[in-house]
Amino acid sequence: MKPIVFLGRKGLSRMKKKVIHGSVATCCAAVAAATGAVTVTPTGRYMAVPVENGAPKVMLEVFDGGRRVAYDQIEWARGVTNWTGSLDLGAAKGRPFEFRFSGKDAPNLSAADLAFSDSRYPAPKGQYGEPWRPQFHFTPPLGWNNDPNGLSCRNGEWHMFYQHNPFGITWGNMHWGHAVSKDLVHWNDQGDVIAPDDAGPMFSGSAVTDAADTAGFGKGAHVLVYTAAGKPHTQRVAWSLDGRNYAKWPHAAVEGRADANRDPKVGWYAPGKHWTMVVYGEVEKKRHGVSIFVSKDLKTWEKASHVKGDLFDEGKYLYECPDFFELPIEGEKGTRWVLTAANRQYAIGTFDGRTFTPEVERLAQWRSPGNVNPVYAAQTFADVPDGRRIQVAWSHFDTRAGGRADAMFNQGMSLPMELKLVRAADGLRLARFPVKELESLRAGAPTPLAGFNGELAEVEFSCEPVADSVVALDVRGVAIVYDAVKRTLALNGKAVAWDLDARGRLGLRVFVDRVGVEIFSLDGLQYVPAPDIVPDPAKRKMSWRASGAKKPVRGVTERAWRLKSIFADR
């Protein structure tokens, strides 16, 4: 099914002059027009959708020969057009489509209100230089994103799909956006690959490479497993042989079996030569949890077991977006399985191919100053050739903050991080590290903090604080303060508990973007994401100081790199 369209009152006849940002759009031939509906023969694959942030929403349904092929709610521009979305009509060119729109503010349209193009409508020049767009984190070119989906590596190419609203900068109209990368750092957006259909909006899921063609789609097919969020929710499958064009399998792989079920994560269990799927599922509208299914062919699934989470009135352990993977224990023989969920909590245990047995539960993946969930719905890449387990999470920051009504996108993703399973003082724990590929963004040799002058930065700082000291870093106006008495680290005044390493040293690795800060410490065991912190654009310097004793710190090491934007060529 293809994306969706909403048509404006005065619409594209005027918009073509103001909004298409220099792209060439052709008009269309109208067969008939009536209040609430117009039949048009599109002259291109993509229809321009003018978006006015905050405008009243209208529902548009698109019909091809009586079959509904698209539907969405759109903040269709009535005054100022903030940006232009692209409705993919697929092979629509040359035959009539009916566009029906409804709602309190539904417009009356004619053929002259619509414009089409054979290519997606481009973003305006300079879009990636927006003052509120991160410069080395992934963000959608246009529209809203939330959960990362379908993270996978195939034929030397990294794939990141994501929950996407292509026609607004708030949640809704869930499609799967798609971006690809050769290095995990620079991403090229490919447009949406699956769109809402009669089974429902396209909620979260995963992707695998079916090397042995167990599903019969073709050897090496790239298979997406996702939730269609109709009533009831169902788990469904789409596939591609070229990694660009995806077709939906017309049946449900898993029918709705609980009050709510969604967000399938699929993996290959080699000892049993079968696929596994973990799916979030509510039980009797009382308890969160994760169900485990098994399959030989990615199409037919058997429920094998269930892992209980919190009761609704207790908390959100095992709530939404599960991930499930095996990791070797660093420096030891053996492995363990890790089960994560959307709101940072995870469990470590054993798995026999059908049943997960937790050994320790309700562990925290990250620390959160102020915002309980600064990042959410973390997922890991499948089929990574070198065996690394790499995670990306949805970063919460609002481009509308501070009264910015003209934003063309909203939200983004965390840095990609390599996960390892280590034995810490209190048992097995996940540790995380920025992927090595990020080092390619370093621009020249590092300097001491006092010698830094720039916008984008990576900072390494280490020292041994004495018992009553306070160590403060000023990183482009962002205050990072360690208090040895309180044993806390504060980020712009919001503190979290903080541990020193076994040698009594404070070690920080800090990434500073145009929007957002991420801190790694304690050999990967401490991670603080702060995507909503905005460094002062006028402040480009760094410094540090220590107080509280005659010699408050020992053994200081420090260095800072300027980082390059991933959009330097755009």
What are these regions (language model features)?
Residues 35-122:
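Extracytoplasmic
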Residues 38-50, 56-66, 100-103, 343-345, ...:
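Beta-rich accessory regions
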Residues 68-87, 109-149, 168-171, 186-219, ...:
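Surface loop/turn signatures of beta-propeller and other carbohydrate-active proteins
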Residues 157-160, 215-224, 272-277, 333-338, ...:
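Entry beta-strands of beta-propeller and related beta-repeat scaffolds
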Residues 161-188:
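Beta-propeller domains
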Residues 166-169, 229-232, 282-285, 398-399:
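Short glycine/acidic-enriched loop and turn motifs that connect beta-strands
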Residues 173-175, 232-236, 286-291, 345-350:
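Structural motif
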Residues 181, 238-240, 292-298, 350:
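Conserved Ser/Thr-centered positions that define the repeating blades of beta-propeller domains
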